């Protein structure tokens, strides 16, 4: 046995070890060709990505700057492959905010992919040995991974910032509608939130649905707001929401029908408690009335134990009037008492007698010295004029409060 047979066989170095020992000559070549690599990478984007040509000149320049910075950072990173991704992150810190808004995340991924594919094709040509080729290949793969994650982080941060800004703008729009501030800024802000400014608007008010554990945190309220938006989107509607105190105020486009599936799905975002719907406004700038009536209804709905869910604010006129809601008092006067007064004193007299007799037609007829059929005819006429049937308990209550309000001479606008 000779001495050569006893000599240990040299272990080949791993790719990571090769990456740690890149010769200075290779690093100098990388730096020398960095400008050319960046320019040709942008040219590759123009050839392989159809959307790139549609970007404005300033946006293409921003992309070129990012690529140039990424190439320079790659050269610096190759000096110390164990360093963090700070060099890589610097490339995306240069991206203007308007560019992150105009270029979708998928397009950014495509640009990163094309750039790194180009690097994989060209950079290895700078190698002068198999070891250098391996080191460059491993370096590109590791660097491209960091670059991809950083791109995703940049867009996630931008999306989060936009989401926060959109939430604040949405809250300001809802607050403006509630306060009746219908200045020109209202429509511009709503339009920025993809609201059709010519669409009718209906306001709902209720308590946001609690969390899975029955909690009522800010996060649960935001989840309920998002549920309203998602439900509206599924049904081809738009929605603006905000939490005012303990109530969730939602403005949805279009009218709401009690039998509509959209309304049923919408109620899932609210707690199992009263939900009040205001009247539909012709457009967003006129939605203050819908909001004020819905909020007034929420304040008064406890007065009607059997109130349906949801309940129209207009069905809560008696309770709202008893709480001093001027608009409810006006509605009772204009929709109930004025039509009866215009028809002559007979119908009001019959209504008072019928209600005083506890809804007994025979007793009412005796009190008025008329035939019971005359009372029935007059009650039908009252229904025709007011839309309220005195023989139905809830309508009778509405008519009673309306008559009381009329007798108390509440001031009403002319």
Curated annotation (Swiss-Prot):
UniProt-recorded Gene Ontology molecular function terms: DNA-binding transcription factor activity
Basic and acidic residues bias spans: 220-230
Coiled-coil residues: none
InterPro entries: CdaR-like_regulators, CdaR_GGDEF, PucR_C-HTH_dom, PucR_C-HTH_sf
One Pfam family cited in the UniProt record for this chain: GGDEF_2
Region (Disordered) residue spans: 204-230
Top-level division of the source organism's lineage: Bacteria
GO biological process per UniProt: positive regulation of DNA-templated transcription
Family: Belongs to the CdaR family.
Name of the molecule in the record: Uncharacterized protein Rv2242
